[in-house]
Amino acid sequence: MMTYDFEYDVIVVGAGHAGCEAALAAARMGCRTLLLTINLDAIALMSCNPSIGGLAKGHLVKEIDALGGEMARNIDATGIQFRILNTRKGPAVRASRAQADKQLYRLRMKRVLENQDNLHLKQGEVTALYCDGSVVRGVDTRSGIRFLGKTVVLTTGTFMRGLIHIGLTHYEGGRAGDLPSIGLSDQLKQLGLQVGRLKTGTPARLDGRTIDFSRLEPQHGDNPPQPFSFSTERITMRQVPCHIAYTNERSHDIIRSGLDRSPLYAGIIEGIGPRYCPSIEDKVVRFPDKDRHQAFIEPEGLDTVEMYPSGMSTSLPIDIQIAFYRSMEGLERVEIMRPAYGIEYDYVDPIQLHTSLETKAITNLYHAGQINGTSGYEEAAGQGIVAGINAALRTRGEEPLILSRSESYIGVMIDDLITLGTKEPYRMFTSRAEYRLLLREDNADQRLREIGYRVGLVSDAEYEGYLRKRDMIQAERERLAATRISMSQAEEEYFTARGLPDLQKGTSYEQLLRRPEITYDDLLSFDTVSRETPSVVREQVEIQIKYQGYIERQLEQIRRSAKLENTPLPTDMDYAAINGLTTEVKEKLTKVRPDTLGQASRIPGVTPAAVSVLSIALKAHAGARKQG
């Protein structure tokens, strides 16, 4: 084994969506960073759907951007259809989604990585960690090179012992066309980490020239398209539509006829699949009364005929795939360019991580992405930027960045993972966040820009832009509170026409906006200053005013829980010796080893009474250490 003659501060293993954000974060913070990947031509490759964002996932992308990450800027530069989802619902659950030109997305991210100072890209398969006792010191590659590093971030995706299934045929692979990673997960087991098995899948890729789009429902994007990044002024890529197709009873009969050759139902696949993204055979079996299922036919790019049938993932044999796709209206002559497949892979139970995403068993080793049991590019990227930041902070000897549940969806996700663990692929939903009215897409920069600037990921220009926006929001709120309607003839006629004749002279614009039937657009009809206010400021101000009571209530809940969240628990706490805790609670606390009292309170089975006992024991523990 040859030892490379350079010691890195941070080594990132894997160049998917988690690895790219981790490597960029560390390098931008001034760390000498190495990004290792099995295939340099597959950096940031969209292995499944060619899209970014969606319900709750869009929130994650906005948060990554606010922290100084790259995903939002990358999709803004390569997106070919943008939509805001849930526009008829409240602001807490509105979400951005964009179709990507799959190849342009990959190529742009690779170019960003290549042009980043302090970042080295190398192709190589990591087969083992190089450890000194319980401290990681570097990585070993199949080509016989040992790279030394102060910290290591593992972002292995679906590659650890990856096994691809198409019907009863199966073969090793990290994804179609790429080799798996063999040996690394076995070593992680030997190091004391609990390794499990999960499964995911992807649909076939269809030849768009063989689809009759005139018989499908077109779905157009928003006009004008709204960017993800707070730094993007406008979208310049050509925009294209998607289309909607449906299965039918004949499709379902074909699928049922192939279940005996489905690895999912033949008992061949051991791993647990994603609950919220089931395969088409799973949908047909679980919902026998449903006479059709929707499929979104999504283009994979502007310069390709490949189409992605979203909602149609499967591991059925290829003859069944061809038959059921061709049973759908508009797809009768469709040709499959790449078959659908399922894939099993190893993951490491995230309950074994600190809030910083550092493993508890191995010092200086961080995990991010699907290795932690999550699904989705956005979930991976959110973990990646946090792991990269914390690996960099470790090399500086600084305290880790901990994002709380009350300030970000990334914080909710990490807390869920390290507190509850997961036995199935985890995906983010707005319902997982108890403070979701505070964690909106539109205010991600107001929540996280300061943090990104403090750690060194947000540029001076971006930070100044954030400060200008923040000050404009505050100034506009003050103006609306101070400006009152005079009930001029124009105002009186407008309010009467809107069915509001009871308005009194002297009512402030702020009081006016609190009414559910009045929007900021109404102010534009008679207030010239409002017409000059930027739309992003108008949006923030209107939400803050209309939901002020609910927002204040959630802020009060956060203040009440702050003491628990800010009380750390010692790593050497002997929970088994604490009198007053049940055996069940002692076992759960010993297994999870929570970082704070707040985290302990969210472990299933740990009651408020147990938290009180734990708080008393913590004070006694602190007193004993002082005397010692």
Curated annotation (Swiss-Prot):
Record-level GO cellular component terms: cytosol
Key words, A-Z: Cytoplasm, FAD, Flavoprotein, NAD, tRNA processing
One Pfam family this sequence matches: GIDA_C_1st
Gene3D superfamilies with a match to the protein in the record: FAD/NAD(P)-binding domain, GidA associated domain, C-terminal subdomain, tRNA uridine 5-carboxymethylaminomethyl modification enzyme MnmG/GidA
GO biological process: tRNA methylation; tRNA wobble uridine modification
Binding site for NAD(+): 273-287
Molecular functions (GO terms): flavin adenine dinucleotide binding
Cofactor(s) this protein cannot do without: FAD
Source superkingdom: Bacteria
Binding of FAD, residues: G14, A15, G16, H17, A18, G19, V126, S181, Q370
Keyword match Ribosomal protein: no
Localisation: Cytoplasm
PROSITE patterns: GIDA_1, GIDA_2
HAMAP family: MnmG_GidA
Subunit structure: Homodimer. Heterotetramer of two MnmE and two MnmG subunits.
PANTHER family with a match to the protein in the record: GLUCOSE INHIBITED DIVISION PROTEIN A, PROTEIN MTO1 HOMOLOG, MITOCHONDRIAL
Job of this protein: NAD-binding protein involved in the addition of a carboxymethylaminomethyl (cmnm) group at the wobble position (U34) of certain tRNAs, forming tRNA-cmnm(5)s(2)U34.
Family listed: Belongs to the MnmG family.
Descriptive protein name: tRNA uridine 5-carboxymethylaminomethyl modification enzyme MnmG
